Amino acid sequence: DYVKIHPFSYGTESKFYSGGDHVTFCTVKGIPVSPLICYDLRFPEIFQACSYQSHLITVIANWPTPRRCHWISLLQARAIENQCYIAGINRCGSGGGLDYSGDSMVIDPYGKIIARAKEGQYLVTAEIDDNIVTQYRKEFPLKADRKPLLYSQLYQCRK
């Protein structure tokens, strides 16, 4: 049911695909999860929206090796900003003239990489402790300080 929110204009996806207009939530072994796709990683707002319900956000991607540093840094930033687990599942190998490093990983709510694939094709597993998300959000209620109405007004000023 989920559709990628942000087609990758730089790669001409937006010429062939329309972006989605909603996010999807599901529960896996009692943990609320949101799936996002590739380029969505560059838009922190969508992660904020998902993290109100989800304790794990997955990002399935085709991030090429030249942007490997962005992939890793943004995954860690999204975990820290949203105080949740992030699972980044990235393509590996080559195709269409591009190389893909893989670098699939799981990051905890503190930004620590708790499981990581080496370069190439690997299975990554990690323990996801839902209580850590709940406890961390209770101890450091970051979302209580957000100002969504102000952010909305600031976006309107740009138009």
Segment roles from a protein language model:
Residues 7, 25, 91-159:
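C-terminal beta-strand edge segments of enzyme domains
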